[in-house]
Amino acid sequence: MTDYRTLFSSPGAGSTVTTPITLSLLLLLSQATSDPCYDPGGRPRFCLPPVTQLVGKAAAPCSQTCALPAASPGPACNSSLTLDLDGSFLLTSVTLRFCTAGPPALVLSAAWATGGPWRPLWRRPAWPGALGGPKKVTFHSPPGPKTRIVASYLRVEFGGKAGLVTTGVRGRCQCHGHAARCATRAQPPRCRCRHHTTGPGCESCRPSHRDWPWRPATPQHPHPCLPCQCHPIGATGGMCNQTSGQCSCKLGVTGLTCNRCGPGYQQSRSPRMPCQRIPEATTTPATTPVASRSDPQCQGYCNVSVSSVHMSLQRYCQQDYVLHAQVSASSSQPSEAVGPEWWRLAVHVLAVFKQRAWPVRRGGQEAWVPRADLICGCLRLRPGADYLLLGRAAQTHDDDNYDPARLILNRHGLALPWRPRWARPLRRLQQKERGGACRGLLPPTRSPGPRN
């Protein structure tokens, strides 16, 4: 291996020859490794792939015209020729070669998709008394960014017999100024995108660089895609919306870059959950009165309070309904008294895992809770929270407001804080019930009423 120190040593044998050669090689190497889409300082700039010979698919009409004598009538000629470029390209020139004098009139059109609409690019009208045109016709795309022609199909309409020999179409891939290289033979042609763009034609930004909407590059401004400014803790990742730049935020986090806590949340010290819900101090009867737990009349009234339940098939079948619901967090009137014995709560049913005789529909519902159950703290419901509700259908009641279609929440059921991991096993139990697994498993008898 050559030591570079010998190439730039003091004059001696061969040093005057090797120094210019080495400088030339280094210059060529720097030109080969430089990126046309970036200047020497690393700043983005407008770039285009080189012009290449494009491949078209078409059969030249009247291909035997050149071999026929001049006096021979010859076969009937087609009136047009369509070229499929196998992709979208920026056209630079179209060349048509004829074996005899070309047709007196020609019309060249371009289209984006199969069947048009066709856009006329060049028209050569027939002069009165003209017998034919030249044997070679070349169309050049006009210069300027506003006059660039993007086409996937070309159509040539002849005004007479045409003995067409070859068609030459030159152009470059449509990379919107964001690429200097392109695989023209790929299906579809794919640009080697720069400026953090992506897509076959560099027509969109990468998911991690969508701080501004995508724009094509121009010689005046390269319009590179900018990285998303997502907060490293408040966002779920580094990707943002293509149009607005909105980052995907964690629960309780808001803002375009996920940099602050939303309403009802406060900052925490956990990087996994940077915003936690603010505990609500509420006086609604839906919460548990602490003083009522020492009331002698409430001793032994409620069922044993549990925080978790093993949901076996038998326990599931013994329930009249199993719901995933959310207690309304409205601050106007989440609950109200209805008569001396009942309170009415607004709930939103999110999922029904077991249906009762009177169907419970998803959406907004009115849940009825006995006043005594609330006073004794049998149900601990917090507005805005999700719960798994296990309960029994209403039975005969002496109250005039009784309705068998009511959704009753009482001390005989359970209201457990919802856990997302419960959804899948509950769906499996629901499928078993539909298959008849609950037949013969009757619910146990309920207690007749409160004990004094």
Swiss-Prot record:
Family annotation (Pfam families): EGF_laminin, NTR
Cysteines paired by S-S bonds: 173-182, 175-191, 193-202, 205-225, 228-240, 230-247, 249-258, 261-275, 298-376, 302-378, 317-438
Domain Laminin EGF-like: 173-227, 228-277
Glycan attachment positions: 303
One GO CC term, this protein: extracellular region
Disrupted-gene phenotype: Deficient mice exhibit ectopic motor neurons that migrate out of the ventral horn and into the motor roots.
Keywords: Developmental protein, Disulfide bond, Glycoprotein, Laminin EGF-like domain, Neurogenesis, Repeat, Secreted, Signal
SUPFAM superfamilies assigned: EGF/Laminin, TIMP-like
Domain NTR, chain residue ranges per copy: 298-438
Intracellular or extracellular location(s): Secreted
Role this protein plays: Plays a role in neurogenesis. Prevents motor neuron cell body migration out of the neural tube.
Protein name in UniProt: Netrin-5
